[in-house]
Amino acid sequence: MNLASEIKDVFTYHKGRYGVRRIHRELVNRSHTVNHKRVQRIMHELGLCGKRPKEKYHSYQGVVGKVADNLINRDFTTTKPLQKWTTDVSQFSFPWGKCYLSPILDMHTNEVISYDLSQSPNMEQIRRMLEKGLGRFASLKGLIFHSDQGWQYQHAYYRNAIKEKGIIQSMSRKGNCYDNSIMETFFGRLKNEMFYGREKDYRSYEEFSAAMAEYIDYYNNERIQAKTKWMPPVKYRMASTC
């Protein structure tokens, strides 16, 4: 297979989600010696263009419970998995209605620890997400769990559930998206790669739910990232805990 064919193969396999940088790294991982500018030129000649970022669900409803201190304070640095997590809710709009995605992201590995997709942004959704995420690990004591000041995270159930595990709660300042930029970046990437321009492809909640499950599995186990030394999140976690 020549280089142009291999570039097209990588681009097609990842459904147009990879741009120049990731395709270049994938070729390097496949033992190719090639300059990223050459990859860029070939992609341009082939008319291959990686998807690029756009919106957001706002869950802030004022002070309805207890607001935690901003312990993260934009310090997203970590030395190993299970030191810092973040969460948020994002909205997806379709001709047939809306869906809401609530994931937990590990700040060290960028792995989606757990997630819940729902047609309603309610406390039951948060409960399901927490049960799946918190139930995966024997000990989470000392972990800092960050979020915005959404009503869900001020709720007594949420605060008590993480406190019981020894988790320390942290919240962004009101209306400051940069305080949770890791999650903002994740949502932008996800929507760009499997939602924007494809809204009409998902004809029902069930179809979108299946596509989301497929994407999260792909994201965790196959999608390489610069932050994780060009490994998928799960592989990077395993390498970090050896």
Stretches with model-predicted labels:
Residues I7, I23, V39, M43, ...:
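Mobile genetic element proteins and their domesticated derivatives, centered on retroelements
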Residues R74, T78-I113, Q119-M123:
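An active-site-proximal beta-strand-loop segment
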Residues E111-Y115, Q169-S172, F195-R198:
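Short small-residue beta-strand/loop micro-motif enriched in glycine and branched aliphatics
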Residues D116-A138:
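Active-site beta-loop-alpha junctions of metal-dependent nucleic acid enzymes
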Residues K163-I167, K191-C242:
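C-terminal domain-tail junction helix/linker
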